[in-house]
Amino acid sequence: MGMQSGWPFFCLLISLTIGSDPHWVTVYYGVPVWRDAETVLFCASDAKAHSTEAHNIWATQACVPTDPNPQEVLLTNVTEYFNMWENKMAEQMQEDIISLWEQSLKPCVKLTPLCVTMLCNNSNGNSAGNSTTNRTEDLEDRQMKNCSFNITTEIRDRKKQVYSLFYVEDVVPIKDGTDNNTYRLINCNTTAVTQACPKTTFEPIPIHYCAPPGFAIMKCNEGNFSGNGSCTNVSTVQCTHGIKPVISTQLILNGSLDTDDIVIRHHGGNLLVQWNETVSINCTRPGNNTGGQVQIGPAMTFYNIEKIVGDVRQAYCNVSEEWGSMWNKTKKKIKRLLGNNTTFKAQDKNGGDLEVTHLMFNCXGEFFYCNTSRLFNESENKTNKTIILPCRIKQIVBLWTRVXKGIYAPPIRGNLSCXSSITGLILEHSGENGNKTVYPSGGNMVNLWRQELYKYKVVSIEPIGVAPGKAKRRTVSREKRAAFGLGALFLGFLGAAGSTMGAASITLTVQARTLLSGIVQQQNNLLRAIEAQQHLLQLSIWGIKQLRAKVLAIERYLRDQQILSLWGCSGKTICYTTVPWNDTWSSNTSYDTIWXNLTWQQWDRKVRNYSGVIFDLIEQAQEQQNTNEKALLELDQWASLWNWFDITKWLWYIKIAIMVVAGIIGIRIISAIITIIARVRQGYSPLSLQTLIPTAARGPDRPEETEEGVGGQDRGRSVRLVSGFLALIWEDLRNLLIFLYHRLADSLLIIRRTLEILGQSLSRGLQLLNELRIRLWGIIAYWGKELKDSAISLLNTTAIVVAEGTDRFIELAQRIGRGILHIPRRIRQGLERALL
């Protein structure tokens, strides 16, 4: 009764045990997971080292060649967050461009010797004719100062007087109360000025920012993307598009365009406007500056302006008529963002640096400062006509790269002109809500790079992932480590990013091979580029960056492999562990939901906070397994006693036996020598070579007696008394051999007795096994007969029941059939009876 009452509880326990289905932590290598990262990027360009064009020089020293086959992989079902205002790529590009400018100025001459007193007069140049046209009649005069000053010659104690033309913005009067014509250069009390080398050019060339191996660049392909928020159209690339590092304020020149519409990116008081169409701007400096050279010291040459041929007023820029429509569209967009009461105005020219109050850019080596009031003032009618911007030219320029650093741009001979495209604006706004004032701005060059890099961000590939699995690590045996082969391209590793975890885990081996092969491929490309330009990369900031990028990926890969090795997962794409999975790590998400609905990226975000805990538990479990394996291996040595009788170990046993016998013989020889020496020292001589000396009988536990007359004699034995050294040695060797013979005989008897006992035990064991076999066979035969009889009885009973049922069914069918057949007869009989 008690057994029957316990059955329900037992069944319930079994059902609970089966239904619990515990999960274990499983390690996956090669999962498509990435995280936001900051790393050292390097640049690539299409510059040619053999080209004689000056603007290729710095690109060949700075960048590696571009990839002729750039790869871009579209990530389906992936949503990624971008924030252009916190994008470290823009800050890194800022530092890199600064380094490039400073590097290009390193060998150039410092102009400290020019910080002297100058006597200056106004100079309007030598007019070569009336070249003023109607379109330039309202341009500003470009006033010049003709200054003379004393400089030190190549011989230090001698001086000479020279003269040079300076723009009025580059000199300031010295107010010492003596003479109103004394001037100095504007930089002398604030800025260290370097003269640009004669061959230095600031013409930009497109550069591509590239991620090192082990990293990737995410790209947002959505139109009208604000640069801050989620993007659903995401792809991964290795390098950005070609970015021209054009330095300018107020207007963005030669940048990228949006594919759909005008986009305004707003952050704080900054407004970055990106157009979808370009507006051309053509700038000109007519006339001919005649340049001269003045030696200001040993190997130091100052390139000055000797005279100007032509009209000094003709420095200007022409903005095409498309400006009006694009500016009107931009204003509507800004009013929609800030409010309808927003007003627009140009920069105040009364205060501030020229770089902020004017449009500053470099045109063919000269620095232009253009008045943009005609572009931004609402009073100006800008519809369907070309706008002329008056420009100034400065030779002493405050560099945007560092505070208190400047550059002297040597004069450029001949006519200067350059054509650019306006692709956006840099604006600021101020005022209270509803009454905003928008005006052009500049000076913070990082905004230029943000405008180009808004759709990019750098991520690091994290190929190691953990997830719950139903399998548990069972054994501690060593497995052969698998080696990964080389596969496809690196970016294909993220191709399964939008797939669910179950679908992506099927291709883990391919993804792991892709990861390694991509690293190897990128390392080879980078090494080839560096080897091709190693003579140019010396002492270059970019050379250091490229070498760092070269080492970084291998370090990351080795780190991942070391982690897998510590977990006992080296060389495996799927590795099972003995760590139970805690449902709280995954917020109690069901197993089927994890593997069928989540991508690896979504799963990583869910368990990221617990990754450290899980990794520690896996490492502890592996350490415990190593301890268990060591103990098992030590125990396994005692479990293999039969290996002691392996034929390969017999020589070792024979060697040990020979050493033991040699040791015993050596000890006996030493004992014999000591005995001989003792006898010789006693000084006796035996009477004969052999004398019979009776010995007393000894009991089993009595010491041997040698004197006569002590007790009775059982038997006599002869003791050999010899003389001579060789005879004594022979006697001792004979006794030793007899001793060894007796010991070996005893050992053989013991071994024979042991073998007899083992044989008897083995025979007895075989008899027991035979009896057990007979009993088992009898039991099997008995139960087989019983099962056979039961089966026969069951078949007989079934046959009888079926036969009886069949007979009854047949009889019933016959009765029904006869009844149906008798119906006409019964009808006829009824009719006959009715008629009678």
Curated annotation (Swiss-Prot):
Residues that span the membrane, as ranges: 657-677
Motif (YXXL motif): 684-687
An example Gene Ontology CC term for this record: membrane
Coiled coil: 605-639
Residue segments, region V1: 120-146
Matching HAMAP family: HIV_ENV
Protein name, per record: Envelope glycoprotein gp160
Gene: env
Region (MPER): 634-655
Residues bearing carbohydrate: 77, 121, 130, 134, 146, 150, 180, 189, 224, 228, 233, 254, 276, 282, 288, 318, 328, 340-341, 371, 377, 381, 384, 415, 435, 582, 588, 597, 609
Chain intervals for the UniProt region annotation (CD4-binding loop): 349-359
Motif Di-leucine internalization motif, residue numbers: 835-836
Stretches of the chain found on the membrane's Cytoplasmic side: 678-836
